């Protein structure tokens, strides 16, 4: 049996916390945790600890929360830990080369896509947005580039037709910890194999924006439907009607032809709101009007039928 690793863990949100929890149940020793500084949250804007910090404190693990690693003090504090390896999961801080070089075995990262397909900030969302058949997690040896390091392990799973970014996030948060523990076992045993990425196959998964999430009815229905799922739970696909912003939580593509201008409401009843697009028809099934929770279209039509008159054209 190989010797347990002395691990420094760096991460911030719940996705990272689930990986930390797996490490705490493994043979390895988590000697310290790095996480983002406490941030104001909630209506009272009270300083709130990250999910990773919460778990670390529950297990009496030392917590470090530097704003960055520019100072000699921050770099020395990491060096003093004498870690074998640093595991980075959705940390949110850029790590300079000096930090990457500090642990004996360097730093590894759990990335939410099959590299090199989607590098960057929003790989889960972009995989749905692009219509990929599968996604997964890649564990890589970190280098100074953006998700360009050598790959140590890949675990995959299919993207179902009903998957949203929220459901994929949950699935990857279960897949990632298992892959991480398996990868660390290989590293500890000296059997891990590093595979270089093919840069020619790489795409940049840029951050999402509210502007991008505004529906363009000139797009084809299949693309809009993928956007609805990719942008759930944020920033939410939306459109304007009667000067109100309507968020779309669930939709489907109707395989029917039409010659109506894009944005035309073709039908509105309990089965959905049928809207002409640049190619095909999109059926809205669950939407959210201002001040209300998401609800089935039938409930919205009972109260706001005038907003969705057949023949009217959405901008």
Curated annotation (Swiss-Prot):
InterPro entries: Fmt, Formyl_trans_C, Formyl_trans_C_sf, Formyl_transf_N, Formyl_transf_N_sf, Formyl_transferase-like_C_sf, GART_AS, Met-tRNA-FMT_C. Its EC number is 2.1.2.9. It catalyses: L-methionyl-tRNA(fMet) + (6R)-10-formyltetrahydrofolate = N-formyl-L-methionyl-tRNA(fMet) + (6S)-5,6,7,8-tetrahydrofolate + H(+). One of its GO terms (molecular function) is methionyl-tRNA formyltransferase activity. Signal peptide: none annotated. It comes from the Bacteria. Keywords: Protein biosynthesis, Transferase. The keyword Protein biosynthesis applies. (6S)-5,6,7,8-tetrahydrofolate binds at residues 113-116. The keyword Cytoplasm does not apply. PROSITE patterns: GART. One of its GO terms (cellular component) is cytosol. Attaches a formyl group to the free amino group of methionyl-tRNA(fMet). The formyl group appears to play a dual role in the initiator identity of N-formylmethionyl-tRNA by promoting its recognition by IF2 and preventing the misappropriation of this tRNA by the elongation apparatus. Belongs to the Fmt family. NCBIfam families: fmt (TIGR00460). This is Methionyl-tRNA formyltransferase. It comes from Vibrio vulnificus (strain YJ016).
């Amino acid at each position: 049996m190989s010797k347990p690793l002395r691990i420094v863990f760096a991460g911030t949100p719940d996705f990272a916390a689930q990986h930390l929890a797996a490490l705490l149940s493994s043979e390895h020793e988590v000697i310290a945790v790095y996480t983002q500084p406490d941030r104001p949250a909630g209506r009272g804007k009270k300083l709130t600890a990250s999910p990773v910090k919460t778990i670390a404190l529950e297990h009496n693990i030392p917590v470090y929360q530097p704003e960055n690693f520019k100072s000699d003090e921050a770099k020395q504090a990491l060096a003093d830990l004498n870690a074998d390896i640093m595991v980075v999961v959705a940390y949110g801080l850029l790590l300079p080369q000096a930090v990457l070089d500090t642990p004996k075995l360097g730093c590894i990262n759990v990335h939410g896509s099959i590299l090199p397909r989607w590098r960057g900030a929003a790989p889960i969302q972009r995989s749905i947005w692009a219509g990929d058949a599968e996604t997964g997690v890649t564990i890589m040896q970190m280098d100074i580039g953006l998700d360009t390091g050598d790959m140590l392990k890949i675990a995959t799973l299919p993207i179902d037709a009903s998957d949203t970014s929220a459901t994929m996030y949950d699935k990857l948060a279960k897949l990632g910890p298992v892959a991480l523990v398996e990868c660390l076992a290989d590293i500890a045993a000296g059997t891990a194999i590093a595979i270089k990425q093919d840069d020619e196959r790489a795409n940049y998964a840029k951050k999402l924006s509210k502007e991008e999430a505004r529906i363009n009815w000139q797009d084809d229905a299949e693309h809009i439907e993928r956007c609805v799922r990719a942008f759930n739970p944020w920033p939410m696909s939306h459109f304007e009607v009667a000067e109100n912003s309507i968020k779309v939580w669930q939709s489907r593509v109707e395989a029917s032809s039409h010659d109506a201008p894009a944005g035309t409401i073709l039908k509105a009843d309990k089965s959905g709101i049928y809207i002409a697009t640049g190619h095909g028809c999109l059926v809205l099934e669950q939407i959210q009007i201002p001040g209300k929770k998401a609800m089935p279209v039938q409930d919205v039509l009972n109260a706001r039928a005038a907003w969705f008159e057949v023949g009217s054209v959405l901008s």
